[in-house]
Amino acid sequence: MTMAETGAPPSALALFAWLSPGFPVGAYAYSHALEWAAEAGDITDESSLESWLRDLMLLGFGRADGILLAHAYGAGAAGDVPALAQVNARAVALSPTAELRLETCQQGRSFLDAVRAAWPHGGLDAAAAHLPPDVAYPVAVGYAAALHGVPRAAVLEAYLFAVTQTLVSAALRIAPIGQTAGTRVVARLMPAVQALAGDIPTLTLDDLGTATFRADLGSMRHETQYTRLFRS
């Protein structure tokens, strides 16, 4: 049976497509409170951006997203839609603010719909029927990757790196940081992101938790920020 008949994508190409800026999930519309951090003076240059993002990825939502993705992947590998629903419910409940819930759920539902349309799979149809409208982004990515045979280690690294790049791209639009400086930030964060991806398979759902309180408070304040480019 050919790939065209099964709809199964080659692993690497699937990740390039699914996590590219051009994939229709609307990632460009969200800053995960970076817009508020720039307005408040927390992010003013290359160094402060790197520090903020390092904390977000290692102590905040990056680590949490990785854990959720890995467990959604496990549910997909086992064909266990009820387990997937439990992981998704935990993911949505952990969103600390309305805007961050919108950020993950809008992207998650859009991702699920786009993959179902272009890379159909019965497991994706089952998930779409069983899950509520709110589907967390890492949950959708992990589940789809498992169904289509993308290695867990590869999707963890790719997802976390893609999120990092997306946030750096957002920062370039709201802070006095140039493209070369942003590229340096991405390069310096790569080893930490790769190490995080390697650690995540040893973690359980009981290890979920974040310690980025100022970013969470910033997301709340962003809801009433006077001038905004981003939805979060």
Swiss-Prot record:
InterPro entries: UreF, UreF_sf
Family of the protein in this entry: Belongs to the UreF family.
HAMAP family, per database record: UreF
Electron transport as UniProt keyword: no
Protein's recorded name: Urease accessory protein UreF
A GO-annotated cellular component: cytoplasm
Highest taxon of the lineage: Bacteria
Compartmental location: Cytoplasm
Subunit: UreD, UreF and UreG form a complex that acts as a GTP-hydrolysis-dependent molecular chaperone, activating the urease apoprotein by helping to assemble the nickel containing metallocenter of UreC. The UreE protein probably delivers the nickel.
Alphabetized Pfam families for the sequence: UreF
Function per UniProt: Required for maturation of urease via the functional incorporation of the urease nickel metallocenter.
UniProt keywords, alphabetically: Chaperone, Cytoplasm, Nickel insertion
Main location as per UniProt: cytoplasm
Molecular functions (GO terms): nickel cation binding
Coiled coil: none
